């Protein structure tokens, strides 16, 4: 990610030609069950009252990490980022209460929420997810303007002929 790392072996803008957006998925703010806040408003109040909180991510620079940093900035809560080497190592610490919260790709944590092992406080998309319509968005829960989704897109090398890019776009869409 060129926005996060000064030295990249490529230039995302100059070296690639965008073909199409394939999919987006919301992230979901999840907390371990010992967190007393049952909704986002109470969680923000708790964070401001208690001081330092921790948030796990599946690694620095991921959409999960960026969601946490955006939340930290927008709420003013003093939060410490704990980067893990992937989701598989972060979730056990969240389940065990060693970290306060995590933004996770919604499809990854939804089952843990449904099983009652984690509590969802909101989704990061602009609208509620059809997969979990009972979970409010972060924005509708009081943090207006908050939106951070994971996205997947198809790119080609920058010198790919436009006709080829257009043909692949047409086939995918």
Regions found by a protein language model. Give the residues of each.
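Beta->alpha turn/N-cap motifs
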Residues: 1, 58, 87, 104-109, ...
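Hinge/capping helix and adjacent helix->loop/strand transition within the periplasmic-binding protein
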Residues: 3-89, 138, 151-173
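Extracytoplasmic "Venus flytrap"/periplasmic binding protein-like
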Residues: 5-11, 34, 111-123
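Small-residue (glycine/proline)-centered packing/hinge motifs flanked by hydrophobic/aromatic residues
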Residues: 6-13, 127-145
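Conserved helix-loop-beta element of the AMP-binding
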Residues: 17, 43, 117-130, 147
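Conserved functional loop/turn residues at catalytic and ligand-binding sites
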Residues: 39, 83, 97-98, 105, ...
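Alpha-to-beta junction loops
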Residues: 50-53, 75-77, 95-104, 117-120
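Short helices/loops that flank or line small-molecule/ion binding pockets
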Residues: 70, 74, 88-98, 107-115
